[in-house]
C-alpha cells in the first residue's frame, strides 16, 4: 500500500526522476524561471527551496552539499552569491508557481515556476 509515502513518481524510475530534478533545479537557478508541468513544478519547489536555504547558511558544508546536487559550478556560485542573499530576511517561500494553461499536444497542465523577487500582482480578469 501507498499510505504516507510522499512525493510523485512522475512515471519514472528513481534514478531518472532524481536526475530530472537536478537538471530542473539547475535550470531554475540559472534562468530564475522555467516552464514545466504542474506536477513537476510542485515537486521541484521543495528541492529548490532546500537549496536556497543551504545558500542562506553559506558555510563550506552547505556549499559542498549544493555542489553535489546542482550540476554546474557557475550556478552554485550564483546561488550562494546572488540568489541566497536576496532572501536573507525571508523565512521560506522563495518560489512561485503560476499556472499557464495546458500544453498543445497532450493537454498536460503547464506552470511557470520562478524565484520570488517582489510582490506578485495578477492581471485583472476579464469578467
Curated annotation (Swiss-Prot):
PROSITE patterns: RIBOSOMAL_L17 (PS01167). SUPFAM superfamilies: Prokaryotic ribosomal protein L17. Gene3D superfamilies: Ribosomal protein L17. Keywords: Ribonucleoprotein, Ribosomal protein. Pfam families: Ribosomal_L17. One of its GO terms (molecular function) is structural constituent of ribosome. GO terms for cellular component: cytosolic large ribosomal subunit. One of its GO terms (biological process) is translation. InterPro entries: Ribosomal_bL17 (IPR000456), Ribosomal_bL17_CS (IPR047859), Ribosomal_bL17_sf (IPR036373). The keyword Cell division does not apply. The keyword Ribonucleoprotein applies. HAMAP family: Ribosomal_bL17. Belongs to the bacterial ribosomal protein bL17 family. Part of the 50S ribosomal subunit. Contacts protein L32. This is Large ribosomal subunit protein bL17. It comes from Pelobacter propionicus (strain DSM 2379 / NBRC 103807 / OttBd1).
